[in-house]
């Protein structure tokens, strides 16, 4: 059994492994609030396009 088949031996349906950024498919630093599901790096790039405004 190869390493790849052991690593992906079952589908991820819950937890951090099940969620990824909808822009770049990155798994760390996800912003899930309001159903965004975007990593923080992509959020900084796309925040103005989405409609978020920095107040300070």
UniProtKB/Swiss-Prot annotation:
Gene Ontology CC terms: cytosolic small ribosomal subunit
Cofactor(s), by name: Zn(2+)
Record-linked InterPro entries: Ribosomal_uS14, Ribosomal_uS14_CS, RIbosomal_uS14_euk_arc, Ribosomal_uS14_sf
UniProt GO BP: cytoplasmic translation
GO MF annotations in UniProt: structural constituent of ribosome; zinc ion binding
Cofactor note: Binds 1 zinc ion per subunit.
Entry-linked PROSITE patterns: RIBOSOMAL_S14 (PS00527)
Alphabetical list of Pfam families matching this protein: Ribosomal_S14
Keywords, in A-Z order: Metal-binding, Ribonucleoprotein, Ribosomal protein, Zinc
Residues involved in Zn(2+) binding: 21, 24, 39, 42
Protein family (similarity comment): Belongs to the universal ribosomal protein uS14 family.
Official protein name in the record: Small ribosomal subunit protein uS14
